[in-house]
């Protein structure tokens, strides 16, 4: 009997997960539940339901009706809503942590307090505030700060001094604005190069993916407003060109400690994807944040590199047997680039047709688009991602860039992601910081 698997979520990340599942030698039958029809996911599915991914009862109802045997939750919102808990309660194993553990992403204040309680390395000096006067005083005291809303913001709520906040006055004003909606985390600003480390987790064991570097700024040269991520790259191997092996080993230890501490704190094993966003400083890797799911775009870099059967990995995650399964990756470099609507992220042009031409050797992943009468149109978010995979970053970048040149529509993208000049800038920056 072929296994019936349900995928929850409808973005570019979920398109990559769907592809990973469908490549399995076990020929699983894939079902999807997504808020909007993703044409890439729909094409890989036996059947799908268009429904809000946070409607817990509807998710369980659909899973039972389709006799689902295992589920994968892609985005953070359904995890925060307790979708994984409800599916487990219905006897359906899930890749995606229960709410008690997913809190590490959806409550930034909880996450920092948890790190402090368990002595998890890489935690900045920070405080959590609900009132203006002490928050403003703490900003004055620290001087160089990052200001974060405590809840989920789709990766766009954090503002940092020297970047989006030109001075202390701006930091105070932004803090006051956020405090109207809820608690605010104010922490020391780290200076360095960011990287993402993701892992499959079975409650105890972690299987790490190669490190990825994402590019949050909208425009070339790392300028402009923050976005959900304009593109990312991996090198052939597990570290990035500006890293040394010791950096990734330290980051792995932090994530392992986090998983062990989560079990102790919550009484529940963390089963799913743990995403560590790190910043590599002169004092080693520090934790920017943890997420309870794959990154988007980072998922599209790493999923195509998995050589071990994806469904077997999912099964091991749900059974706690990841330690018995060697998870292998091909030693190739990848470059992912997003084509986004003109005006994104502040004033995106929606309902504009997207025509995907000859993309050559690249992979294409549909994100926030919709299909109407056989044509594909933009919404207000990132539209289509392309991924080049090759022996070197430079070669992978060319594959991705050539594919983008053959996608038509009122779109733009960053040509500089994965290029030698931008990577050299990162290497030089780290050399300077390390002295």
UniProtKB/Swiss-Prot annotation:
EC number: 6.3.4.13
Keyword Phosphoprotein recorded: no
PROSITE patterns according to UniProt: ATP_GRASP, GARS
SUPFAM superfamilies: Glutathione synthetase ATP-binding domain-like, PreATP-grasp domain, Rudiment single hybrid motif
One GO BP annotation of this record: purine nucleobase biosynthetic process
UniProt-listed InterPro entries: ATP-grasp (IPR011761), ATP_grasp_subdomain_1 (IPR013815), PreATP-grasp_dom_sf (IPR016185), PRibGlycinamid_synth_ATP-grasp (IPR020561), PRibGlycinamide_synth (IPR000115), PRibGlycinamide_synth_C-dom (IPR020560), PRibGlycinamide_synth_C_sf (IPR037123), PRibGlycinamide_synth_CS (IPR020559)
Cofactor binding comment, as recorded: Binds 2 magnesium or manganese ions per subunit.
One of the record's GO molecular function terms: phosphoribosylamine-glycine ligase activity
Keyword annotations: ATP-binding, Ligase, Magnesium, Manganese, Metal-binding, Nucleotide-binding, Purine biosynthesis
Catalytically driven reaction(s): 5-phospho-beta-D-ribosylamine + glycine + ATP = N(1)-(5-phospho-beta-D-ribosyl)glycinamide + ADP + phosphate + H(+)
Annotated positions binding Mg(2+) 1: 277, 289
Pathway entry: Purine metabolism; IMP biosynthesis via de novo pathway; N(1)-(5-phospho-D-ribosyl)glycinamide from 5-phospho-alpha-D-ribose 1-diphosphate: step 2/2
Residue span, ATP-grasp domain: 112-319
Binding site for Mn(2+) 1: 277, 289
UniProt binding sites for Mn(2+) 2: 289, 291
Residues involved in Mg(2+) 2 binding: 289, 291
EC top class named in words: ligase
Residues the entry annotates as binding ATP: 139-196
Cofactor(s) this protein requires: Mg(2+); Mn(2+)
PANTHER family tied to this protein: PHOSPHORIBOSYLAMINE--GLYCINE LIGASE, PHOSPHORIBOSYLAMINE--GLYCINE LIGASE, CHLOROPLASTIC
Family designation: Belongs to the GARS family.
Name used for this protein in its record: Phosphoribosylamine--glycine ligase
Lineage, opening ranks: Archaea, Methanobacteriati, Methanobacteriota, Stenosarchaea group, Methanomicrobia
């Amino acid at each position: 009997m072929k296994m019936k698997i349900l995928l929850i979520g409808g973005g570019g990340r979920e398109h990559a997960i769907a592809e990973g599942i469908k490549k399995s030698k076990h020929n699983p039958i894939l079902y999807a539940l997504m808020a909007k029809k993703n044409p890439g996911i729909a094409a890989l599915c036996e059947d799908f339901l268009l429904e809000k991914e946070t409607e817990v009862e509807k998710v369980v109802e659909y899973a039972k009706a389709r006799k689902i045997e295992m589920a994968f939750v892609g985005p953070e919102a359904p995890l925060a809503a307790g979708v994984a808990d409800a599916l487990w309660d219905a006897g359906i194993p899930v890749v995606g942590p229960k709410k008690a553990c997913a809190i590490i992403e959806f409550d930034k204040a909880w996450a920092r307090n948890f790190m402090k309680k368990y002595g998890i390395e890489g935690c900045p000096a920070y405080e959590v505030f609900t009132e203006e006067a002490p928050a403003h005083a703490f900003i004055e005291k620290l001087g160089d700060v990052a200001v974060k809303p405590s809840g989920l913001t789709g990766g766009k709520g954090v503002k940092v001094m020297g970047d989006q906040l030109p001075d202390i006055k701006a930091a105070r004003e932004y803090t006051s604005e956020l405090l109207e909606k809820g608690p605010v985390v104010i922490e020391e600003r780290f200076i360095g190069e960011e990287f993402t480390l993701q892992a499959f987790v079975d409650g105890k064991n972690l299987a790490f993916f190669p490190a990825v570097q994402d590019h949050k700024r909208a425009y070339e040269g790392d300028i402009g407003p923050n976005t959900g991520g304009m593109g990312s790259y991996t090198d052939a191997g597990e570290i990035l060109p500006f890293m040394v092996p010791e950096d990734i080993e330290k980051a792995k230890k932090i994530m392992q400690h986090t998983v062990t501490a989560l079990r102790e704190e919550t009484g529940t094993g963390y089963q799913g994807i743990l995403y560590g966003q790190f910043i590599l400083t002169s004092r080693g890797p520090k934790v920017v944040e943890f997420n309870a799911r794959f990154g988007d775009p980072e998922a599209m870099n790493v999923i195509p590199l998995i050589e071990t059967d994806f469904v077997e990995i999912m099964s091991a995650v749900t059974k706690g047997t990841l330690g018995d399964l060697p998870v292998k990756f091909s030693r190739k470099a990848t470059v992912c680039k997003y084509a986004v609507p003109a005006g994104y992220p502040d004033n995106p042009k929606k309902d504009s047709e997207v025509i995907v031409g000859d993309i050559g050797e690249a992979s294409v992943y549909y994100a926030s688009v919709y299909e109407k009468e056989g044509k594909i149109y933009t919404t207000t978010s990132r539209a289509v991602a392309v991924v080049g995979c090759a022996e070197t970053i430079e070669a992978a970048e060319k594959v991705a860039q050539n594919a983008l040149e053959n996608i038509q529509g009122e779109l733009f993208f960053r040509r500089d992601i994965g290029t030698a000049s931008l990577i050299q800038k990162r290497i030089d920056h780290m050399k300077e910081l390390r002295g």
